[in-house]
Amino acid sequence: MALQKAGVDLANEICKNDPVRPNLPLGWRVAPCWKEVFYLPFTYFSVSEDRYHESIDAVLCVAHLNEIPISEDELLSFGHGNISVFYSVWSNRKGQGRQIIFDTMDLLKGQHSNNRYVTMSPKTEMAMKFHLSNGAVLLRENEETNNFEYK
C-alpha cells in the first residue's frame, strides 16, 4: 500500500510505540506544514477469521527545521525551515524502513522547497549500518546522535 500521512490523532496513537524517540511529546510531532508523521500501512486477509486486518509496516517522523539538530532539546526548540529532518524511523517488516525513507523523500521533493534531507539518528551501530547501506553520507558525529544526509 502507498505512503500515508497521519493526522494528529493517528500520529499520537502510532507514536506511543516509538522505539527511537519515546521521550518526545506526542502533541509536538504534528503541526501544519512543518512537522509530519508518515507511515506505510499493510493490509492482509485472515482466512481463519474471514476478515481483513490493517497494520503498520513502517513509520517516519519528519520536522522541517531551520537548523540541523544534534539533540532532542535542539529538535524541540529549532524553528520552521527548509531542512527536512528525519528524527525517528522504525519498521515492523524487513525492507520497509528503507522504503519509507525513499517514499517520503520522493513525496517531499514534490511538495516542499526543501533541498536537504538529514537524519538525527541514535548513535548506534544499527543506525550507522542502516543509513550508510541506504546511501546516506555521515554528515556529523555528535555526542548523543549522528546526522546523516540523503541526496
What function would you assign to each model-found segment?
Residues 1-37:
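Short amphipathic alpha-helix that is part of the acyltransferase structural core
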Residues 54-85:
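Conserved acyl-donor/pantetheine-binding loop and adjacent beta-alpha core of acyl/acetyltransferases
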Residues 91-110, 133:
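Conserved acetyl-CoA-binding loop-helix of GNAT-fold acetyltransferases
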Residues 118-129, 144-145:
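Conserved beta-strand-loop-alpha-helix junction that forms the acyl-donor binding cleft
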Residues 129-137:
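Short, aromatic/basic amphipathic alpha-helical patches
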Residues 137-150:
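Conserved catalytic-core motifs of GNAT/GCN5-like acyltransferases
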